[in-house]
Amino acid sequence: MGRLFGTDGARGVAITELTCELAMQIGRAAAMVLTKETNHKAKIIIGKDARISGDILESALVAGICSVGADAHILGVVPTPAVAMLVKKYNADAGVMISASHNSVEFNGIKLFSGTGFKLSDEIENEIEALILDTPEKIELKDGCDIGHVYYEKDAAWDYIRYVMKTVQTDFNGIRVALDCANGSASVCAQRIFEGLGAKCIMLNDKPDGTNINKDCGSTHIEGLQKAVVDNHCDIGLAFDGDADRCLAVDEKGELIDGDKILAIFSKYMKSMGILKNNTCVVTVMTNLGFFKYAKANGIVAATTKVGDRYVLEEMLKGGYNIGGEQSGHIILLDYANTGDGELTGTKLLTVLKCTGEKASELAACMECYPQVLVNVKITADKKGMWDKVPEITDAIKMYSEKLGDEGRILVRESGTEPLVRVMIEGKRTGIITEYAHKIAELIEKM
């Protein structure tokens, strides 16, 4: 992966790591590269989530873009998938989303989209990185009338809302849904989408103040949603993350429906409707073992990729598949969107609920989740890429894998967005897999 851009763009602690200077440099380099690629003055749209550092980084990005002669179109607070959708609608050459997704408020990130709405290719990202890090002297600043313009797209959120609503072929009359907006981008759109389609909405965490994004709420903290669903007698609850590109659900009993179960529900429904392309659902190596058993039992192919929605999308495009996603709630429905879209996912869940007449708990029962233990081990920069070269660690993983046999599995991997090694173990006996996970984690900590 690149030196600035990880699996999900450039990310770090805002201002001190992801600095204003770096944001301006990314704006300049991206605008220059895109102007060269398109052979015309680049038009770049910019969205952001609701965190306090978004305004500052947006200003720096805009300054960078316009200082090399490109035009910047500001969308305001919108979901990440809105940028991917609007870049095509507005005939832009690229889109930028300023967000750190599910991370806490001190973090922020910069993610780039191409003019087709897909994440910018590795080749273009590498070219942008090289211009910033290796040959900054090649950046050509403009002056006078050659400086770029700044435009404000005041209808951006509504353009996205209308698009999502148009993908729904039924109404949600009679459905009570609780929506946890994570005090982020979903606060702008979710209620309008679901109430506009007829649902009765119970709103949670929909008042962002710049500092409360993802704070004990949203898809990483669903306890409040679980309680709200039960207390308010809802049919279902939906939890989004800070930029609303992922969605988790809660059934009417308050039980979690994670991304794996959402994929199972969707793939089963799509197969029954004859719209599951190539009879395949794309998942990752972190997908619950229960999904693979469900898929096999239902004649569905589970195509497997590395962790990261960009790899899921690559496999979908390569194989001509129309559904894929991750346990975290990144669900890509390629018939409608080029990226994970939490609010779109939520509308499709309610569509299945309405069209089948089943309760959310009944839909989720199509798949049995195996107990899964995840231990995150913090590592320093000098230890990155080292764990799998330590015989004591690899021997332990092999030994515990043999003990689990077909009734479990072990996956150890480095995070693409945080300084962590993740140790994940699945199996039927929670006590055993917890013990194994912590023993492996201890070995990694000692390396």
Each language-model region and where it sits:
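Phosphate-binding and adjacent anionic-ligand microenvironments
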Residues: 236, 273-447
